[in-house]
Amino acid sequence: MQTPPEYIPPAGSVLMFSTTWCGYCRNLKGQLDRAGVSYTEVNIEEVDGTAELVAEVNGGNQTVPTLIFPDGSSATNPSLATVQARLADVASAGR
């Protein structure tokens, strides 16, 4: 799946697709905040087309949190360590 350009976050940050009721999303946001990881949140129940995008990334399931990285790759319900490692990998690759 090709991530639409409007959902590619700037270097050093991630875009998080979430919902207001998602406990995993709240947990990950708290971890990202405490670790100083920059992110933009997009509620898939409020932004047209994003639920479909998340479903496409996740084999037909609207699973959140789904994160998009600066290289256009994604991860579903990742740990903080995974997010930090992926951001470091993207940065070292110069993306």
Name each region found by the language model:
Residues 2-38:
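Local sequence-structure signature of Cys/Sec-based thiol-disulfide redox active-site neighborhoods
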Residues 23, 46, 74-75:
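Glycine-/small-residue-rich active-site loops that bind phosphorylated ligands and cofactors
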Residues 37-51, 62:
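Thiol-based oxidoreductase modules, predominantly thioredoxin-like and allied folds used
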Residues 52-58, 86-90:
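Short amphipathic alpha-helix with an adjacent loop that forms part of the alpha/beta core around
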Residues 58-67:
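Structural micro-motif
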Residues 69-95:
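Non-catalytic, surface beta->alpha helical segment in thiol-disulfide oxidoreductase systems
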